[in-house]
Amino acid sequence: PAPYSEISQVTARAVKDVQASRDQKELTQMGRAFNEQAQAITAQAIRAFLSRQHNERDVKTLQGLGIFPRSDRDGYLVLIHILRWEPTADHWEKQLLAVALNNIAAETFAVHSELSPIASVDEHSYAMLLQNTAGEEMDLEGIMRQLMYISNVAQQYLRCSMAFYLDDKLPVPKMPDLWEKLLHMQGENVTLRSGVFRLKEAPRQPHIFRVPQIRTWNTLLKDGYPEAVKQEAMTLLDEMSARGEMNADSLRSFYQDFMQMIYFTVGGSEEKIHELFYQPEALELYRNGMKSVDEMKALIRYVTSSWTEHKSVDESKELLDKLKQ
């Protein structure tokens, strides 16, 4: 038989391994429990933060876990206002609606590397904090377009209308001050008008087209040349791909410029944008347009098919040549 000292050492190692295994299982179980409750924990932290009743240590812990916006970076604060439910729609309990909104927002903003936790504040009000975590940061116009998309999804699937109140990005510690102003803005919406509303309408900076050719398509669509827009857009995508210029960033720029061009074409009318992307199939095209060249082409085909063709293809080509000159 082995000496007692060896048996003792082996036994001690075995006990240590068993204890380590138990500790690992406990940590795994704790991690799983936290993940299941992460949304609720973050929501509680948001409510406390906006009402200035938060514990700074708890906030820093959640920031370290990457589920709460960092205090040393700017972000956007959005008040989501549930306006009306359709007469035949089931009214969602606020916590379940918060889960649904979190899922929709995460799917919408994750492709832009935007953290987007949402917390229910009362039966009709929800707070969303947005902050870029990597890559190119979305501007206010981009944020507002994505909020319109969420509004369309809610109208289609949750069967309720919404209003969104926000302002330009600001340091996270200043968000409680802005929250009070957004609540006042919500209270002023006594007609329950849906849409995306800024706290103060500052003079808009002109959109800088990163794909300059797209800027001319606004005139083509307005004058009744959607077929020319489609042909030019398809050709441009193919040429950029052939030259090796097409990647995730350049496709995102193409998508954003194209959507901005559409926004200009309808005169900035949120109602017309809503009508254009109301159907589920259209919403999918809108959401997936920046994921691949094929998806972008499908979006272009849908948008241009929604405009009435007033001119012949030859006339469209002639005008396009003039615009290029």
Predicted regions and their residues:
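Interdomain helical linkers/hinges and coiled-coil/dimerization scaffolds
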Residues: 3-142, 169-175, 179-187, 194-219, ...
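A generic secondary-structure signal
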Residues: 107-108, 153, 235, 239
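A short glycine-rich, hydrophobically flanked beta-strand micro-motif that places a catalytic Asp/Glu
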Residues: 162-168
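Conserved NTP-handling cores and scaffolds of large molecular machines
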Residues: 15-18, 22, 109-112, 154, ...
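Alpha-helical bundle regulatory/interaction domains
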Residues: 202-324
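Cytosolic nucleotide-binding catalytic cores of signal-transduction proteins
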Residues: 113-116, 120-126, 139, 155, ...
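Generic solvent-exposed, charged/amphipathic alpha-helical segments
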Residues: 12, 102-106, 147-155, 183, ...
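GGDEF/GGEEF active-site signature
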Residues: 134-158
